[in-house]
Curated annotation (Swiss-Prot):
Keywords, ordered alphabetically: Autophagy, Cytoplasm, Hydrolase, Nucleus, Protease, Protein transport, Thiol protease, Transport
Protein's name in the database: Cysteine protease ATG4
Active site, renumbered: C172, D362, H364
Organism: Gibberella zeae (strain ATCC MYA-4620 / CBS 123657 / FGSC 9075 / NRRL 31084 / PH-1) (Wheat head blight fungus)
Substrates-to-products reaction catalysed: [protein]-C-terminal L-amino acid-glycyl-phosphatidylethanolamide + H2O = [protein]-C-terminal L-amino acid-glycine + a 1,2-diacyl-sn-glycero-3-phosphoethanolamine
UniProt lineage: Eukaryota, Fungi, Dikarya, Ascomycota, Pezizomycotina
Leading EC class: hydrolase
Complex and partners: Interacts with ATG8.
Family: Belongs to the peptidase C54 family.
UniProt keyword annotation of Hydrolase present: yes
GO annotations of cellular component type: nucleus; phagophore assembly site
Residue ranges, compositional bias (Pro residues): 79-90
């Protein structure tokens, strides 16, 4: 439903229509479950907001979650929580339970969500479809048309051979990739800490300038398409998959960005420490903040339940000004319209979690192109606001597409050691694996014996051309 609405110009009536057709999720204020945004926890009951590493420096986030909820249940004399190995499914947005109905007798401001969570969520940089940018020429290759999404092929067959001045209908994965990269850079430059909208405006404008919809911007839609065509076999107007997106992020960042580096695993879940360290800390150099990108598939049609716990726990990883590791991921999901037909649909950027629900930023909203200003201070408040949203969207983990690109930021060697420890202690089945070296390339027999059985490779050739953005 949300995807269909995003492509319809409702003008001043959009908000009214959304209330009935696409309502925002509401928080169960009685149960007051913690809600997480990239490693920070928020709740309503006045208790101190926590980070996953507060007072528990040696406790994995998933275990900490169970301990925290058990203690809170005891303190408030609430009925005990279900076992930690059971799926943690909170009440739906509209609950029929007696206690929940009492909670919604009176209107709840901002859906009952903690104000700190809303402020944190809104501060995340949100890249969406854009229109009216400098046209991107179509490919002259005869195979280019067949590689386009269905909607774009129909337009071509109806005689529309004009260059692309909008990425609506094909650029959602690129926009999600931009969101991931922009928020990673923001954390390094601005600090995860308590940075919120309206603070360090000039620095934020310098960051947004790099993502402007202009060929001069290093991380523009034009730059992604240009590198996709030259190095990934992607034609202009063709839907990108996780692998192509990761390769573009890595190449563009390593060419233009001095504050971070990028390590990509390619099409599998295995991270090799020797390869990672060659990028993050070459001999004789200090450690460089490094974004690790993992392309993986956690099931066939849906995410296998054994991965649920680890996937949700990933968004609870600790971070602060000094400890900057956090997880984020992009996946194709099923929207309300396509659940019934079972067709894979869209790319979304996930940054938060509550129980078994995950919160995401949706790129399927077309806005006027973000201009390129030589002087970043020239960005208007409206242009900056177009890169943020307080609009919450969430999906249950069981409804997510299993094909995804996972990203996490390692700021220093302490982060790296902690990540390795947490991966070993995660509940359920780990979504990534860390080994000392690539046994195949290094000629060593060492490595995980179960690696061959576990790996499901993720190839853009298998996944991209059948999807519409």
């Amino acid at each position: 439903m949300e995807r269909a609405m995003a492509n319809v110009d409702l003008g001043p009536y959009r908000r009214i229509v959304q209330i009935f057709w696409d309502p925002e999720p509401t928080n169960d204020v009685v149960h007051d479950q913690p809600v997480w945004c990239l490693g920070r926890s928020y709740r309503l009951n006045g208790k101190k907001n926590i980070k996953a590493d507060d007072h528990h420096p040696q406790t994995p986030p998933s275990v900490l979650k169970a301990e925290t909820e058990t203690q809170e249940a005891h303190d408030t004399a609430q009925p005990p929580n279900p076992p930690t190995n059971a799926p943690d499914t909170p009440p739906d947005s509209i609950s029929s339970s007696f206690s929940s109905s009492l909670a919604y007798d009176d209107p709840v401001v901002d859906g009952g969500w903690p104000s700190g969570f809303i402020s944190d969520f809104e501060s995340k940089i949100w890249m969406t479809y854009r229109s009216e940018f400098e046209p991107i020429p179509r490919s002259t290759n005869p195979q280019a048309t067949s590689a386009l999404s269905l909607s774009m092929r129909l337009k071509s067959q109806l005689g529309d051979q004009s260059p692309f001045s909008s990425d609506s209908g094909w650029g959602c994965m690129i926009r999600s990739g931009q969101s991931m990269l922009a928020n990673t850079i923001a954390m390094v430059r601005l600090g995860r800490g308590d940075w919120r909208r309206g603070e360090s405006v000039e620095e934020e404008c310098r960051l947004l300038k790099d993502f402007a919809d202009d060929p001069r911007a290093p991380y523009s839609i034009h730059s992604f398409v240009r590198h996709g065509a030259s190095a990934c076999g992607k034609y202009p107007g063709e839907w990108f998959g996780p692998s192509a997106t990761a390769r573009c992020i890595q190449a563009l960042t390593n060419s233009h960005e001095s504050s971070i580096r990028v390590y990509s695993t390619g099409d599998g879940p295995d991270v090799y420490e020797d390869e990672f360290m060659q990028i993050a800390k070459p001999p004789g150099e200090d450690f460089h903040p490094t974004l690790v990108l993992v392309g993986t598939r956690l099931g066939i049609d849906k995410i296998t339940p054994v991965y649920w716990e680890a996937l949700i726990a990933a968004l609870q990883m600790p971070q602060s000004e000094s400890q900057g590791k956090y997880y984020q991921y992009i996946t194709r999901t099923f929207s309300a319209l396509t659940i019934r037909s079972g067709r894979p649909s869209s790319s979304h950027y996930f940054i938060g979690a509550q129980g078994s629900f995950l919160f995401y930023l949706d790129p399927h909203h077309t806005r006027v192109a973000l201009p390129y200003h030589e002087d970043p201070i020239e960005y208007t408040s409206e242009e900056i606001a177009s890169c943020h949203t307080p609009r919450l969207r969430r999906i249950h983990v069981r409804e997510m597409d299993p094909s995804m690109l996972i990203g996490f930021l390692i700021q220093n060697e302490v982060d790296w050691q902690e990540l390795k420890r947490n991966v070993k202690h995660v509940q359920g089945k780990s979504i990534i694996h860390i080994t000392d070296r690539n046994a195949v390339l290094g000629g060593s027999s060492e490595g995980r014996e179960s690696a061959i059985d576990e790996v499901e490779t993720l190839s853009d050739d298998d996944t991209d051309t059948i999807h519409e953005a």
